[in-house]
């Protein structure tokens, strides 16, 4: 199973991520997003950052997760290569919205500060959006699709 693939959207760029678990989808979407920004094979694991996000739906959590990673890139220049989920809570096993449930994810992101002399600049991603957003389970595979503003 492939981990992610870019989606060609007129005027924007999208990403489709896959996983055997919802955690894997979050990891693969983040790595896929980083690969749209630069060649992640050139990223070294020189430092790590901790990310924690909590929202009231799986869709909100997914978009907020990616936007938090974009924030760390835009603000601090940090670009990730490897992600370890430290904890996650997705309410019940259903991916339907339940306003009383909490959806959380905490992870350690390993990477380094972006260096334009060593790292290729591909796309400047401004934000993950809700446009055509999908997070779902199809048979035994979790999938997520997201469109980015560039």
Predicted feature residues:
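Intrinsically disordered, low-complexity regions
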Residues: 1-150
